[in-house]
């Protein structure tokens, strides 16, 4: 990157100017300005020639329309005015993440676009294919986005702060649109990168929403305002903080290009491990890394084989735009998707509406799950969803208990109620145009596999306690511990487990995670101790049973069940990880994960169900942003009949130099930034809390009755005759085997396609050998 002025010292007194500008687009009353970029930025640009002036001018639009009426009210976008065909739209949504998280994502996107431009043999991509890609950044609230992020956007030419005004002719501005084709990138170390790093120009649309209206509203701007204007083929969704691999976006796009019936594709999300994998020293991060790996090796491949992935991760996923479009009658995937925004926005405004839609509001906490189901079950179509393992992206995972609980509360509640929704509406599959074979397998996945998984999830608390109770109860019959030694040890840990679970209910109902993080941490540690104790007792039981084998013992059946269960978990996990050439998490994270299983099973489940009244995304809506009616644009007709506006602003060159100074200051004093923000849940009304109580009571009593029934039927020391324990162990084995078979099927399918495509290329290129692994 060419050296940008380093000798600048900021001046406290800024130059204020007033000027009249002629509006360049839109209809009467729409403010669209062409503003020159700062002089210092123009000096370092390698490309300045363009018939549209896209490298030397930034377009600002004060959008007074709602997203659904964007085009109808005369608003448009640069790419449409230039007559360009858009193949991919890349949308980055953000709230108040820091500049390091934003730079990490944006620089990764620019490297992906550079890769598209480097594919000279492609029929679609090539040298100038950056013109086919539009990057859209949507910031959720002008008073919420961090100033440091705006400084990075200013440095790349994509933002000029002095242009944003809350009103135009007394009409409220709902979104500020800044459009610029940038040639500058800033990496996560806050260092400038340019064309000497083989980066290509990138068309950027920065949409700065005036009010904070949640992420789903940001997607409304994307899908209902911008996409109808751009009409892209594929839409890629990214969260700020996610670092896509250099080929991730191409690999996602290729899934759509290869199969015309693919409506959505999920990339592989990896936990950010840090330099030298330092983050794995945190057990919480290590357990999440293992969980993500299991999902990417076992769950996602199985679902992809069926054609229906229950959730496409918002951090890295893609959709075919034509598949998202509604039917002519207004029903369809997007209509169902945005119903969640209407429900949640009305939650605090209309109590009666809240009563009618409480369960739907919880369901739409996982609105992306609803979108996935609506795509696969879209009437008269045969869309499928695919997992693209070669499209990878790193994301920062919660590193504290409070952040972890807040994130998983929404995931668990949304997933549970969304699963009920898809099970209830599974008959919609018969209105699709899928083949009979596909419909059959979708029923197997959705109605059988998902139903069994849902039942196990619902009774996971009781299954955990009963497994702990019967496994540790085997000590009661051990004579080596004395006449009553085994009984008292069992009783002590049994009461400890009951006390911890009871405490979790109390603290989850009455406390926020950020206010009670030490209590939650203590309870998680105690649960881990219980799990460690149960693990030790299990091994003792296995060793003792083997030692007494053939002497008339009655524990052989349960012994076989335990061994099979262990092989189905540790064994199959290890085997599939090796087959996928990705075994390192088994060595670095498996111990942390298995010790954290009780916390995943109990702590997260209890906290989520005890907070079903909270139907927020974890951020408070900014319904009353700071407004100044005097700070607005006034549009008038001049003597020539043209529309013009008076602008009072500061010197953009001075502003730009000050921005560069601030970025360098942050770079020299750079601290490790996480990109997280504390999120305060909305207060629920009395009705929502009443329903929460009923849900928790029903769930708790159902699990309690099941526990009491099993405890009455089987004695703790009679492990050898315990059919329930054997059933649970075999059920775990069977479910793990099903996942492994599906994962293996996906692997075979992937390699088969790779070799078929390679053979076709060999025939065309003179038998050139394949140069890469299909999974990478």
Swiss-Prot record:
Biological process terms in GO annotation: cell wall organization; chitin biosynthetic process
Single GO MF annotation: chitin synthase activity
Disulphide bond pairs: none
Catalytic activity, reaction form: [(1->4)-N-acetyl-beta-D-glucosaminyl](n) + UDP-N-acetyl-alpha-D-glucosamine = [(1->4)-N-acetyl-beta-D-glucosaminyl](n+1) + UDP + H(+)
CDD domains listed in its UniProt record: Chitin_synth_C (cd04190)
Class in the EC hierarchy, top level: transferase
Activity control, per UniProt: Requires proteolytic activation.
Spans traversing the lipid bilayer: 451-471, 487-507, 523-543, 558-578, 695-714, 723-743
Family annotation (InterPro entries): Chitin_synth, Chitin_synth_fun, Chitin_synth_N, Nucleotide-diphossugar_trans
Compartments where located: Cell membrane
Keyword terms of this UniProt record: Cell membrane, Cell wall biogenesis/degradation, Glycosyltransferase, Membrane, Transferase, Transmembrane, Transmembrane helix
Protein EC: 2.4.1.16
Membrane topology designation: Multi-pass membrane protein
Biological role stated in the UniProt entry: Polymerizes chitin, a structural polymer of the cell wall and septum, by transferring the sugar moiety of UDP-GlcNAc to the non-reducing end of the growing chitin polymer. Also involved in forming cross walls in the hyphal phase.
Name listed for the protein in its UniProt record: Chitin synthase 1
Organism of this sequence: Candida albicans (Yeast)
């Amino acid at each position: 990157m060419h050296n940008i002025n380093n000798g600048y010292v900021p001046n406290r007194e800024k130059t204020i100017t007033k000027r009249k500008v002629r509006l360049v687009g839109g209809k009467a009353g729409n403010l669209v300005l062409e503003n020159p970029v700062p002089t210092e930025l123009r000096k370092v640009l390698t490309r300045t020639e363009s018939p549209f002036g896209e490298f030397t001018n930034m377009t600002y639009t004060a959008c007074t329309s709602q997203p659904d009426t964007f085009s109808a009210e005369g608003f448009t976008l640069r790419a449409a005015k230039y007559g360009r065909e858009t193949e991919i739209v890349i949308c980055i949504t953000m709230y108040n993440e820091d500049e390091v998280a934003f730079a990490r994502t944006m620089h990764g996107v620019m490297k992906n676009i550079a890769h598209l431009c480097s594919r000279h043999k492609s029929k679609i991509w090539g040298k100038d294919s950056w013109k086919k890609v539009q990057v859209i950044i949507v910031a959720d609230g002008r008073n919420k986005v961090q100033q440091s992020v705006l400084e990075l956007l200013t440095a790349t030419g994509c933002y000029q702060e002095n242009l944003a005004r809350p009103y135009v002719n007394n009409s409220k501005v709902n979104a500020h649109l800044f459009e610029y084709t940038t040639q500058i990138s800033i990496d996560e170390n806050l260092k400038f990168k340019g064309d000497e790093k083989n980066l290509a120009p990138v068309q950027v649309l920065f949409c700065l929403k005036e009010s904070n209206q949640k992420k789903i509203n940001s997607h409304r701007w994307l899908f209902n305002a911008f996409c109808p204007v751009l009409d892209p083929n594929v839409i890629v969704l990214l969260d700020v903080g996610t670092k896509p691999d250099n080929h991730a976006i191409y690999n996602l796009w290729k899934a759509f290009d290869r199969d015309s019936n693919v409506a959505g594709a999920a990339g592989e999300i990896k936990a950010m491990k840090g330099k030298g994998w330092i983050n794995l020293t945190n057990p919480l991060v290590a357990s999440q890394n293992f969980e993500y790996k299991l999902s990417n090796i076992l769950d996602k491949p199985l679902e992809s084989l069926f054609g229906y992935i229950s959730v496409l991760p918002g951090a890295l996923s893609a959709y075919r735009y034509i598949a998202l479009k509604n039917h002519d009658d207004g029903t369809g995937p997007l209509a169902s998707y945005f119903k969640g925004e209407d429900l949640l926005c009305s939650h605090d405004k209309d109590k009666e509406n809240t009563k009618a839609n409480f369960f739907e509001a919880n369901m739409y906490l996982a609105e992306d799950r609803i979108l996935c189901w609506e795509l696969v079950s879209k009437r008269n179509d045969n869309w499928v969803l695919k997992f693209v393992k070669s499209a990878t992206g790193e994301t920062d995972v919660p590193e504290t208990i409070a952040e972890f609980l807040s994130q998983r509360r929404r995931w668990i509640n949304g997933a549970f109620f969304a699963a009920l929704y898809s099970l209830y509406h599974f008959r919609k599959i018969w209105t699709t145009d899928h083949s009979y074979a596909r419909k059959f397998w979708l029923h197997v996945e959705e109605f059988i596999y998902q139903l069994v998984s849902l039942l196990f999830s619902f009774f996971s608390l009781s299954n955990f306690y009963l497994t702990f109770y019967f496994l540790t109860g085997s000590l009661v019959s051990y004579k080596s511990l004395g006449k009553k030694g085994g009984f008292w040890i069992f009783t002590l840990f049994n009461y400890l487990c009951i006390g911890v679970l009871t405490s979790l209910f109390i603290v989850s109902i009455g406390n926020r995670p950020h206010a009670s993080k030490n209590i939650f941490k203590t309870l998680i540690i105690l649960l881990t101790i219980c799990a460690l104790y149960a693990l030790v007792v299990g091994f003792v039981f296995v060793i003792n049973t083997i030692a007494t084998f053939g002497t008339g013992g009655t524990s052989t059946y349960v012994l076989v069940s335990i061994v099979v269960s262990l092989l189905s978990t540790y064994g199959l996990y290890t085997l599939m990880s090796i087959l996928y050439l990705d075994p390192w998490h088994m060595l670095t994270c498996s111990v942390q994960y298995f010790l954290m299983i009780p916390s995943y099973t109990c702590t997260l489940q209890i906290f989520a169900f005890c907070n079903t009244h909270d139907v927020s995304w974890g951020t408070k809506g900014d319904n009353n942003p700071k407004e100044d009616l005097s700070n607005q644009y006034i549009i008038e007709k001049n003597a020539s009949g043209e529309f013009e506006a008076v602008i009072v602003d500061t010197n953009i060159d001075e502003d730009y130099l000050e921005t560069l100074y601030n970025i360098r200051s942050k770079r020299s004093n750079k601290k490790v930034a996480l990109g997280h923000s504390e999120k305060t849940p909305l207060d629920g009304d009395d009705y929502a809390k009443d329903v929460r109580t009923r849900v928790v009571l029903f769930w708790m009593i159902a699990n309690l009755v099941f526990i009491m029934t099993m405890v009455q039927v089987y004695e703790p020391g009679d492990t050898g005759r315990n059919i329930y324990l054997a059933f649970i162990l075999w059920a775990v084995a069977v479910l793990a085997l099903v996942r492994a078979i599906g994962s293996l099927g996906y692997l075979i399918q992937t390699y088969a396609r790779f070799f078929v495509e390679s053979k076709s290329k060999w025939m065309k290129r003179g038998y050139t050998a394949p140069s890469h692994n299909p999974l990478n």
